[in-house]
């Protein structure tokens, strides 16, 4: 069973007279244990696709379902709880709390989710895996772009969501760190049985993906690795 499914999604911006059609009848699903890439050129609507999938933005028509439950049928409070407890976001804006040190970012997640004390062993392992153990006492303003991105990834994964939605998570990383992030997402999907959806234009992640979709001219289609490498 799909953990998340988009059915006949259409998204328009603008008025009826000057309407921009971003998505045309998008159908997409992800199962637990899968790492899925969604690729496409700049301006193709990849980020809009991700925010619709995560319930941060509503489609003009169509539905989003999480394990068979239509998100539109939920109350606002239920949708908020769904995003808080079931979905982990890694967005391009990072959204780190500027006045909290790196280690405090994770304590903040625990407080928001009301999970009690932080699991220091789990956190230490995650920070080491991402190569950011030495950053725990730094503020976001003291981090490089790549460091900030890795902290944002760690924070999303530490919350232990069922679904991870990542928007260009390797944009500020070198090839070595890209491979580390790819392996981390792959491990998260396979060993922790999560559904991981990564929106990217970074073909270096193709080696780690179970499936790759392309968004082009508002439509989505499944592509094989060889097709994408030949582009």
Q: What positions do the PLM features span?
A:
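Conserved ABC transporter NBD signature motif
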Residues: 62-70
